[in-house]
């Protein structure tokens, strides 16, 4: 009975819509007028249409390597800090991990086709550091990793989708964590630039938009203040990790990340920019603040909040 009532309402609305449309055209209005009126109605109702954006607005989707690739030990890939972290009981809900994830490593062609059907202009994805350099500078470049990302980039371009590539999105080769503590050591700056150079050299002829590090502020917060992300370091009152100092280590980590970013940007601009003509920057995890009251003190508080979180 409920279903019949719903169908009756639906067909009644459909009939009214048809009659209304017929009445409008019988009064001499053109299809162009109707389209403009429809857009105005949609805009008033809060409906977002592509036509409301400037012609050069870029519509895109994004992922990160650990979240979607899977194949965590296939074709020469090494362990990342996330591979190790998620295999420790209690670190994730129900022991979930990215061993398979969305299986993008094997199904990237399907994923690219789906993006093409969506009509997106750009796809931002990250390269798994441990798939390119399983042991950082302490091992060889993995040719299967290079081949995989070449295939992804080439097929994106064939579908008219611009690749936006993040060099590091939370994941670090576990080898570097074990050898010198990852982002806690200045040695990682050299490793990161070495890795970035390989990315520029192998993919830069087609990739014109680079992001060095994804959200360094959140890596610091989640991994070294709260201990919720690898390497799970923290101290009271923020958490009860087995090791870490939530007051000092985040500053060291951000310092090393910013210098790694700066050195990679310098390398790109010096050695690759003239030939490849790309752009390079960093992604910061945003927080938005509103003044509590409409007065100078509240606006100053907003400024302080932005300065504290973003520098």
Feature map (PLM): residue ranges:
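Aromatic-acidic/polar surface patches that form glycan- and anion
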Residues: 50, 97, 101-104, 108, ...
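A short, flexible beta-alpha/helix-coil linker loop
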Residues: 129-134
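Catalytic domains of carbohydrate-active enzymes, especially glycoside hydrolases
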Residues: 107-128, 162
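Classical eukaryotic N-terminal signal peptides for Sec-dependent ER targeting/secretion
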Residues: 1-12
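Active-site region of glycoside hydrolase catalytic domains
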Residues: 3-5, 18-92, 135-138, 143-311
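Aromatic- and Gly/Pro-rich amphipathic surface segment
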Residues: 78-113
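Short, acidic/polar
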Residues: 101-115, 188-199
């Amino acid at each position: 009975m409920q279903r019949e009532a719903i169908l009756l309402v639906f067909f009644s609305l459909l009939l009214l819509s048809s009659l209304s449309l017929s009445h409008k055209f019988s009064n001499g209005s053109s299809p162009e007028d109707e389209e403009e009126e429809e857009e105005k109605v949609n805009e008033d109702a809060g409906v977002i249409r592509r036509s409301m954006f400037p012609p050069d607005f870029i519509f895109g989707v994004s992922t990160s390597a650990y979240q979607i690739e899977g194949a965590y030990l296939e074709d020469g890939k090494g362990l990342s800090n996330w591979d190790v972290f998620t295999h420790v009981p209690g670190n994730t809900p129900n022991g979930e991990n990215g061993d398979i994830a969305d299986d993008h490593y094997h199904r990237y062609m399907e994923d690219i086709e789906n993006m093409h059907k969506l009509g997106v202009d750009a796809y931002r994805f990250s390269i798994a550091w441990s798939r390119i350099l399983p042991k950082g500078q302490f091992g060889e470049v993995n040719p299967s990793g290079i081949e995989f990302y070449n295939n992804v980039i080439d097929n994106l371009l064939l579908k008219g989708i611009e690749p936006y590539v993040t060099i590091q999105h939370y994941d670090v080769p576990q080898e570097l964590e074990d050898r010198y503590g990852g982002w806690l050591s200045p040695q990682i700056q050299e490793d990161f630039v070495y890795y970035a150079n390989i990315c520029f050299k192998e993919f830069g002829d087609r990739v014109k938009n680079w992001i060095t590090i994804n959200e360094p502020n959140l890596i610091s917060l989640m991994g070294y203040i709260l201990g919720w992300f690898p390497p799970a370091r923290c101290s009271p009152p923020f958490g009860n990790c087995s090791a870490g100092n939530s007051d000092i280590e985040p500053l060291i980590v951000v310092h090393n990340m910013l210098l790694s970013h700066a050195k990679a940007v310098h390398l790109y601009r010096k050695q690759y920019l003239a030939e490849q003509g790309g752009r390079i920057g960093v992604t910061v995890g945003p927080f938005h603040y509103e003044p509590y009251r409409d007065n100078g003190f509240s606006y100053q508080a907003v400024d302080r909040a932005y300065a504290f979180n973003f520098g």
